[in-house]
Amino acid sequence: MIISASTDYRAAAQRKLPPFLFHYIDGGAYAEYTLRRNVEDLSAIALRQRVLKNMSELSLETRLFDETLAMPVALAPVGLTGMYARRGEVQAARAAAAKGVPFTLSTVSVCPIEEVAPAIDRPMWFQLYVLKDRGFMRNALERAKAAGVTTLVFTVDMPVPGARYRDAHSGMSGPYAAPRRILQAMTHPAWAWDVGLLGKPHDLGNISTYRGNPTGLEDYIGWLGANFDPSISWKDLEWIREFWNGPMVIKGILDPEDAKDAVKFGADGIVVSNHGGRQLDGVLSSARALPAIADAVKGELAILADSGIRTGLDVVRMIALGADSVLLGRAFVYALAAAGEAGVRNLLELIEKEMRVAMVLTGAKSIGEISADSLVRELGA
C-alpha cells in the first residue's frame, strides 16, 4: 500500500490489525458523534492564504516546559500501544526521540516505564490517572522520577469509563470476547507472529510491576475499571503537586472555568481534550472548545490540545486557535500498527512537511507567528 499522506496510515492499520484492536483505537463512545465532530470541526476551519511574504527562512521549533521541540507536537498517551506493534511503546518512543518531539507513556502501557525510558536519548513524559489505589499512584510516580521522566500528564476526564459500544461488537469486550479475539488473531497471521508471539509479554507492564503478577486484557477492563475514582476533586491532586517537582499537565479540560481552576491549582499546562471522543459523547469538539479556553488562560500556563488532529494542517489550525502545542494519539498508533517505528517516523515527517506548506502559504515564519489572523473569519462568525 502506498503511503503518501499522514491520513493513509488508517487504512493500512485496518488491513494489518485484528478487528478488536483496530476498532478499539478507531472507535469512540456511544454513537461516536463527538469522535466525528473532532475531525469535521477541525478540518472545516479555513486557513487564510497569504502570498509574496519571503518565506525563505522558516522554523517549526518551539519551547515547551524547558524542552526544545522540533515542532509543536508530542505523542499522546495511548493505552495498549504495545499491542499494535512488537513492544510498541519502545518503537514509538524511539521514533519520537529521533524526530525531536516528546513521547508520553500511558499508565496502561504494555511496556513498563523501566523498559521505555532507557531506550531513548531524551526525557519522556508519563501519564497517570487518579485511581482508588493510591498506593499504585505513588509507586508509579516514584518509578517515573527514578526513570528520569520530566513531565507528568494527569488525565482527569476518566472518573468513570466511557461506554464504548463498538468494543462489544469487535471482540474487545462483550460476550465470548476472548475466543473471538483468538479467532481474529488466527486470520491475521502477520500480526499474530510479530506482535502476538514475538511481542510477549502482553501484560500491563506498569501495573504488573506494582502488583507483582502478570496482567492482561481482562485486568485492563476489570482492575482498571474498578479503580477509577468518581469522587476525584482538585483536592485529591494536591499531594501529587507537592510530590512531583517537574511540570504537571492536566489533561481533559473542555471548559474555561476548569482551565481557570487549573491555573489556581498551580498546573504548568492543560490539554484541551475530550479523550478523542472516547468518554462523553455529545460534548464540544476540542477545536470548538479551544478558543474560549485560550481567551481565559493564555499566558498563564501552557495550552496543549488533542482530539481530531490527523494532519500538519490540523496542527497549524490548533495553534491558530490558541494551543501552544498538540498531542497526536490515533494518528501515530495507525502508523505504528502499519509500519512500526519507521511508520511513526514517516508520519512525523509528513506532519512536518504539511505544517511547512501551511506556514509558507499563510505567511507564518515561526510557530509564534501562527495566530487567529492565520484563519479566515467566516461570514456570521
UniProtKB/Swiss-Prot annotation:
FMN binds at residues 106, 127, 155, 251, 306-330. Substrate binds at Y24, Y129, R164, R278. It comes from the Bacteria. Keywords: Cell inner membrane, Cell membrane, Flavoprotein, FMN, Membrane, Oxidoreductase. Residues 1-380 form the FMN hydroxy acid dehydrogenase domain. It catalyses: (S)-lactate + A = pyruvate + AH2. GO terms for cellular component: plasma membrane. Pfam families: FMN_dh. GO terms for biological process: aerobic respiration; lactate metabolic process. Its main location: membrane. The active site is at H275 (proton acceptor). It is found in: Cell inner membrane. GO terms for molecular function: FMN binding; L-lactate dehydrogenase activity. The keyword Acetylation does not apply. Its EC number is 1.1.-.-. Catalyzes the conversion of L-lactate to pyruvate. Is coupled to the respiratory chain. Belongs to the FMN-dependent alpha-hydroxy acid dehydrogenase family. This is L-lactate dehydrogenase. It comes from Pseudomonas paraeruginosa (strain DSM 24068 / PA7) (Pseudomonas aeruginosa (strain PA7)). The lineage of its organism: Bacteria, Pseudomonadati, Pseudomonadota, Gammaproteobacteria, Pseudomonadales.
